[in-house]
Each structure stands twice: as structure tokens, then as C-alpha cells.
Amino acid sequence: MKFSLALLATVALATISQAAPVEKQVAGKPFQLVKNPHYQANATRAIFRAEKKYARHTAIPEQGKTIVKSAASGTGSVPMTDVDYDVEYYATVSVGTPAQSIKLDFDTGSSDLWFSSTLCTSCGSKSFDPTKSSTYKKVGKSWQISYGDGSSASGITATDNVELGGLKITGQTIELATRESSSFSSGAIDGILGLGFDTISTVAGTKTPVDNLISQNLISKPIFGVWLGKQSEGGGGEYVFGGYNTDHIDGSLTTVKVDNSQGWYGVTVSGLKVGSKSVASSFDGILDTGTTLLIFDQATGSKVAAAYGAKDNGDGTYTISCDQSKLQPLALTMGGKDFFVPADSLIYVKQGSQCIAGFGYSSMDFAIIGDTFLKNNYVVFNQGVPEVQIAPSKA
């Protein structure tokens, strides 16, 4: 489900504090940052994709760090590549036997593992060739995903081995594209790896990669830690399955309850402040690594924009001052603690003499807490409880 908003959303532009046990990582193979010259910042498209993505499941309108190959310790670390202005983050994942490298956007807002293949005659990227994998098994169920900008993809299901940070999942359900819109061909990624709950999988009854990491005893804890870097600080990012990396945590982790009744990592934001000024009371939000922006409902977005003197562009985006010294931090209160979005992230991109804000609005009645927030705050996602733990992040 995330694919719709997350993967492409990113393409678009697109209670109690608890100290947690230390989870360390081991030095491994470095990954280089990759830039895609075809990408263009487009906040409007990010908003459209987000709306379409979530409408499917609700009735309401590198510099990468290091890889850890340590299955014995029950954790696996996957480095991420940061594309352009933090538009999206992807990892290179191994699929099949022998392994084929697939670039996937990791998305906590969806639950499908989707990518292009040689079965698709219209795909710009034919990343996976099933005829070259000895462990590939065709299942043949149909799937289809569409997006708010009119783009779409569809295909069939199969199973194969998938490796994440040295952790090899056997018999993982994969969705192979047999058709996709032309807009996919210029993207940096080959598909999406959904990290949401299996209740929102496009193909009913499908186990997600996290489900299989748990059931196949590949990770010691049903958690994964997420650090997303900033281009201004060298880019990159990292997912740690089965643990988290304290090297990217600045302070203590705060536990926040999760409502997963709709398949997402839903949280309650109990307050919203610009500087010391309160601009909104309690509202619901979804922690979504696959969405570029911080997207509010329209009423909340209007209040935030007014506090910053931002102009509504009429398409879900705002024009904001390019002078960071005039922008106070935006604080979201969760679990009794404030978590901040600093001035440098309140400006998403400069277009000519104007700047587009890192926040926007949609017609939905909940917020999508995307990368504008997540690249400033480390999150440990716990599928087992469910809950999340959040702390300020550091590069």
C-alpha cells in the first residue's frame, strides 16, 4: 500500500521516556551515494500520491553507513542511499539464487514487496529476471496498484529468497511487475519493500518481509530501527532489523503507543507547536518512511502555515520564507515529549526565488508523518507490541 504514496510520494519530491538496551553494529562494506539526474522536486505530486495511497485502505476521503552480516546475533543492518533533496531513500536488496541486486524504497506505510522484472515489456527498468534464479517459484496471483497522479503498475506473485543485511528470508512472496506506467522508467528505484502490517497487503494472506524475519527466527526481537540522513549532512541512512543503532540516537528513547487497526504505525500527536506557540491540539498521524513530506489535514496545515507566514499554493503545498533564521522549530508532542523539525527541514526545496515548505496538507483527516520529521528523529518500530520508540537523531 505504501508503494503508492511512499515510493512515489518520495519520487514526487516529494508515557514515559525509557532508556533502551544498547544495540551496536559492526563495520562492513561502504556504499556510495547515488544521484539520479532525472529526478525533479515536486511537492504537489507527493501530496497526490499520499492521498491516493491512503485512500486505498480507508473510507475517509549513499552515503550509506555499513552492512552488518551477523545473523547469529539476530540483527541485520541495511545501508540506505539518499536521493537528491531527501526525496526518497533506497537500499540494494538481494533477491534470488544467485542473488540479483534490486533497488527498493523501504516503506512503513505499505506492506507489499514490489519490483520490476523481465516479465514486463513496458518497464524502463527490468531489474529481476526470474529465469536466472533457481529458487524462484511462480504463484501467479494478480496484483495492481494505482497512484494519485494517474500512474499505475500490475503483475503477478511468486516466491523467492530475499536477503536483508545478511539475513536470508526463504520463500518470501514477491510481486513482479508485468506492466507499469512510463513515469516509473526514469526513477532511481526498482520497487518498494513494505514494512507495514500484513493486513494491508495488496494480496490477502501475504506474509511481509518483517513477518518472515520473525517467523523464521532470523531476528532476536520483532523490531527495526530507522535512521534517515540529510543531503546537507552527507545523506545516507540505515535500517537495523532486530535492533537499532545507538550511534544515531541523540538522547533517550521515548515509547509511544501504536494503533495498527488499519495496518499502519498510527500514533497520537498530543500537541503541535511553532517555537513556544501552540498551533494545534491532539490529532492522529501515521509514521511513514515512504512519504517525503510532513502532511497535515487541511485545518491543521492552515494553522501551521499561518504561524510561519506561509502561502497556500492551492495544491496541498505552501510557499515559505527562504530565510531559515526566521523559522522557529516545529515541535510534535508524542508520548509526553516534544520532537522537533528544525528550520533546515521546514524548507523542502528552493524554486527560483521562492521556497516550498517541507510540510503540506491533504483532504484526509489524519497526518502523514513522513521524512521531513523522520530525518530528524530516530524511530524504533516494534511490530510485536505494537509500539514505537522515538529519539532525536544524529548523523
Curated annotation (Swiss-Prot):
Q: Which residues form the Peptidase A1 domain?
A: 89-391
Q: Which residues form the propeptide?
A: 20-71
Q: Name one Pfam family in it.
A: Asp
GO-annotated biological processes = proteolysis
Going by the UniProt record, its keywords in alphabetical order are:
Aspartyl protease, Disulfide bond, Hydrolase, Protease, Signal, Zymogen
What does the similarity note say? Belongs to the peptidase A1 family.
The entry's protein name is Syncephapepsin
Q: Which organism is it from?
A: Syncephalastrum racemosum (Filamentous fungus)
